[in-house]
Amino acid sequence: MKSRLLIAGAIVGTLLVAACGSSSSSTGSPSPAAARATIAVATNSKLGQILVDAKGITVYLFVKDTGISSTCYTSCAQIWPPVLTGGPPQAGTGATASLLGTTTRTDGKLEVTYAGHPLYYFVSDKQPGDATGQGIDNFGGLWWVLTPSGAAMH
């Protein structure tokens, strides 16, 4: 319970900083680039094999999304930034290329999908191996790390 309160406090603090900060779009998460995103598999000490980006940062799915359509925008996307790509995403070590795809967000940017799930980062994950968003109930639904098959890791 205490860790959930700390996470909730971090989320509120992040929103306050974002609201009071400069016009920069920095969220503390990996910055979206025009390059093609790479999704790979890494071993997490607590969760086992999970999906990550090319830098080893954990990616998540949102259970509220339907099909490949993202439902996370505005304040949600500040806490859970989408994994963006400048073209077809690439499969890194352990990832299955046929499970990778994209969906077009309302702003026209391409978001990476895996096994039909739009992918997101969590703003509190700062380094490879962090998976602090696992199982959080936020913005009307649960957030899960993905297994190499693309299933939610419960």
Residue ranges and their predicted role:
Residues 40-58, 104-117:
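Short, low-complexity cationic-aromatic patches
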Residues 95-151:
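Extracytosolic low-complexity repeat regions of secreted or lipid-anchored proteins
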Residues 29-44:
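N-terminal low-complexity, Pro/Thr/Ser-rich intrinsically disordered segments
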Residues 59-62, 120-122:
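Hydrophobic core segments of beta-strands in well-ordered, beta-rich domains
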Residues 69-101, 141-153:
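A low-complexity, Ser/Thr/Gly/Pro-enriched, surface-exposed linker/loop concept
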Residues 21-23:
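Bacterial signal peptide processing site
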Residues 15-19:
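C-terminal motif of bacterial Sec signal peptides marking the signal peptidase cleavage site
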Residues 1-9:
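Bacterial N-terminal signal peptides that target proteins for export
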